């Protein structure tokens, strides 16, 4: 047992619940704003088009179609909303 271990033992409270509470309080504002933006009508419609495309492509065994365009449309709509709201939530 070294000096560092002894100092660590003296400074830690040893209460794992306290450490968990501190970790739970941290919430990424980007995640929160993205979730809010995904509820907007424009994003909901883009997600529906993406999900329909995914179902269509998944149901076929041999297809060259992919859902890249639909994915980019959804991400663009969501990120456009996020860009206007994110910095209002930062300190």
UniProtKB/Swiss-Prot annotation:
Record-linked InterPro entries: Cyt_b-c1_6, Ubol_cytC_Rdtase_hinge_dom, Ubol_cytC_Rdtase_hinge_dom_sf
Subcellular location: Mitochondrion inner membrane
Organism superkingdom: Eukaryota
Membrane topology qualifier: Peripheral membrane protein
Family of this protein: Belongs to the UQCRH/QCR6 family.
Disulfide bonds: 37-81, 53-67
Subunit architecture: Component of the ubiquinol-cytochrome c oxidoreductase (cytochrome b-c1 complex, complex III, CIII), a multisubunit enzyme composed of 11 subunits. The complex is composed of 3 respiratory subunits cytochrome b, cytochrome c1 and Rieske protein UQCRFS1, 2 core protein subunits UQCRC1/QCR1 and UQCRC2/QCR2, and 6 low-molecular weight protein subunits UQCRH/QCR6, UQCRB/QCR7, UQCRQ/QCR8, UQCR10/QCR9, UQCR11/QCR10 and subunit 9, the cleavage product of Rieske protein UQCRFS1.
Renumbered residue ranges of the record's region Disordered: 1-30
Transit peptide, start-end: 1-13
Residues recorded as bearing N6-acetyllysine in the entry: 42, 85
Role played: Component of the ubiquinol-cytochrome c oxidoreductase, a multisubunit transmembrane complex that is part of the mitochondrial electron transport chain which drives oxidative phosphorylation.
Gene Ontology biological process terms from the UniProt entry: aerobic respiration; cellular respiration; mitochondrial electron transport, ubiquinol to cytochrome c; oxidative phosphorylation
Molecular-function annotations in GO: ubiquinol-cytochrome-c reductase activity
Name of a matching Pfam family: UCR_hinge
GO cellular component terms given for this protein: mitochondrial inner membrane; mitochondrion; respiratory chain complex; respiratory chain complex III
UniProt entry tagged with the keyword Metal-binding: no
Comp. bias (Acidic residues): 14-27
Keyword Nucleotidyltransferase among UniProt keywords: no
Primary subcellular site in the record, as a coarse category: mitochondrion
Name by which UniProt lists this protein: Cytochrome b-c1 complex subunit 6, mitochondrial
Keywords: Acetylation, Disulfide bond, Electron transport, Membrane, Mitochondrion, Mitochondrion inner membrane, Primary mitochondrial disease, Respiratory chain, Transit peptide, Transport
